[in-house]
Amino acid sequence: MKIKGLNLYIILFLLCSLSSRASFVLLPMEAEGQQNHLKAYGITYWALDKSYKVSWLLNYRGGSFLLPDAPEIRKECQIRGVTFEVLSDAATNSILEDISSPSQNMETVVLEKAPKIAVYTPKGKQPWDDAVTMVLTYAEIPYTEIYDEEVLSDQLLLYDWLHLHHEDFTGQYGKFFGNYRSTPWYIQQKADAEALAKKLGYNKVSEEKLAVAKKIRDFVIGGGFMFAMCSATDSFDIALSAEGVDI
C-alpha cells in the first residue's frame, strides 16, 4: 500500500509539474512593459514566417502577442532586445479566459501566416517622405518597394498587403504644391511624374494615376489588404470618383 501511495504521489507531482511548466511566450505591448515595440512586431512576423501560430490579444496589455514557447523564439527576442514573459499553461489559460469574458472589451485573434508586404513608394523619394520603410526596416519586417510600373503590370498579385502613404492619385502633384512648388526637389518630382506617365503610354499624370488607382481597387476587391495614410486616403477615393472629369 505504501508503494502504491508513493507511486500515486509521484504521478501527481509530475502532472502538476507538467501543467505549470512554461508553454507560451508573451510579448507585452503596453508602454511600460515593452522596451522595443517595433522589434516586437518584427519578432511576431518572424515567428509567423517560421510557421508558428501567434495569438494577438487585442486590448490586453496594449495588444500583446502570445507565442508558443520555443528556444529559438526566446533567443531571437534576446538578440533583438524584445521584452518577453514566459507563461505556464495555467497562467495562459487564465489570461485567455479573462479576455473571452463578455464583461471585457478584449478579443483574441489567431495569426497564422506572414503576409507578403508591398510598399507603394516612388523611386526618387525624399528621406522625410518614407517613414514607413524606415520603420519596417528597423522592425526587421521584410517588404518590397513597388510603384506605378509594377502596379500596372499586375505585380500586386504577388502580395497580400499593400501600404500607401504620401501619394496624390488625382495627378495634381501632391499637397506640397502651395509651399514648395519652386523648390528644386519639387520641380524634379513633378518632372519625374510626367516622364513616367509618358513612358507608360499616358498623356497626363492624372490619367496614369487613375489607372494605378483602378489596379489597386481591383487588388482590394480580389481580397488584398490595403492600408492607406496621409494624402493617399483622400486622393485614392477622389481619383476613382472623378473618373471622366478633368480636375
Model-derived features with residue positions:
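Bacterial N-terminal signal peptides that target proteins for export
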Residues: 1-8
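Hydrophobic helical h-region of N-terminal Sec-dependent signal peptides
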Residues: 8-15
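Glycine-centered structural positions embedded in regular secondary structure
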Residues: 13, 82-83, 232
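N-terminal signal peptide c-region/cleavage motif recognized by signal peptidases
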Residues: 17-19
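Hydrophobic targeting/anchoring helices
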Residues: 22-130, 139
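Helical hinge/lid and interdomain linker segments adjacent to catalytic or ligand-binding clefts
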Residues: 25-35, 65-75, 125-233, 237-239
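Oxidoreductase and adenylate-handling cofactor-binding alpha/beta cores
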Residues: 239-246
